From Swiss-Prot:
UniProt site (Homodimerization): K143
Segments carrying motif Homodimerization: 45-49, 115-127
Name of the protein this chain belongs to: Anaerobic nitrite reductase NSHB4
Assigned protein family: Belongs to the plant globin family.
InterPro entries membership: Globin, Globin-like_sf, Globin/Proto, Leghaemoglobin-like, Leghaemoglobin_Fe_BS
Annotated localization: Cytoplasm; Nucleus
Keyword match Transcription regulation: no
Organism this protein belongs to: Oryza sativa subsp. indica
Gene: NSHB4
Amino acid sequence: MAFASASNGAVRFTEEQEALVLKSWAIMKDDSANIGHRFFLKIFEVAPSARHLFSFLRNSDVPLEKNPNLKKHAMAVFVMTCEAAAQLRKTGRVTVRDTTIKRLGSTHFKNGVSDTHFEVARFALLETIKDGIPASMWSPEMKNAWGEAYEHLVAAIKEGMKPVALL
């Protein structure tokens, strides 16, 4: 999916897209722990092999549904994703609380995250949001708004995944 970026590198996220993201995030926010957990369960349903990307899951016998480390991580990632999306238009760029995009990029690079993984996560995120809001709210425009926001976040993470050239 293509996304718009102004010539100065600022993100263009329309007022309508922002309104859709903010409205749906307001509904999901209070249940973000459970919705975030469902997001990751959907990722592992679509791509079971993605478990190896998470050090806290590699040698764990705890079922995904009950794994406290997964629940904690899933909530943090879901909240970060939604908050970054909600601020996209206001800030004109991807902003992330408690960490930096460069660190996220470095972690994703170190763990071998690929374009395919980002696509699986995009699919899982959109399905999770669709299930996390009233059916009457879900629309092609809502899907597009969240998809656009996700693509901006991924682009920022991928920028941080580039190896630093040594001079």
